[in-house]
Amino acid sequence: MTKSELIEILARRQAHLKSDDVDLAVKSLLEMMGQALSDGDRIEIRGFGSFSLHYRPPRLGRNPKTGESVALPGKHVPHFKPGKELRERVSSVVPVDMVDAAD
């Protein structure tokens, strides 16, 4: 699901809200979450999961074109940990590629 698909679905489900208001709400939420993470804050949405930053230490990479070794610096990357309710909800879902493989 893309951001625009999410906005469209929410606008249909909440018919009393204007599509522009739903668009603004979703974009504002995502902007605030991005800002919180860039400030080093952790975001927890009970039952859904939490967003935090994980540190990736410096490592030796390789340039795929030349094969030359390249030193890559350490960095922080966003990390999502699903909550218990979300894990339980998706545990019964059969992945699409497994359904395709059965055909």
UniProtKB/Swiss-Prot annotation:
Signal peptide: none annotated. Keywords: DNA recombination, DNA-binding, Transcription, Transcription regulation, Translation regulation. InterPro entries: Hist_DNA-bd, Histone-like_DNA-bd_CS, IHF-like_DNA-bd_dom_sf, IHF_beta. One of its GO terms (molecular function) is structural constituent of chromatin. Pfam families: Bac_DNA_binding. SMART domains: BHL (SM00411). The keyword tRNA processing does not apply. GO terms for cellular component: chromosome; cytosol. The keyword Cytoplasm does not apply. GO terms for biological process: DNA recombination; regulation of DNA-templated transcription; regulation of translation. Residues 62-81 are annotated as: Disordered. Belongs to the bacterial histone-like protein family. This protein is one of the two subunits of integration host factor, a specific DNA-binding protein that functions in genetic recombination as well as in transcriptional and translational control. Heterodimer of an alpha and a beta chain. This is Integration host factor subunit beta. It comes from Xanthomonas campestris pv. campestris (strain ATCC 33913 / DSM 3586 / NCPPB 528 / LMG 568 / P 25).
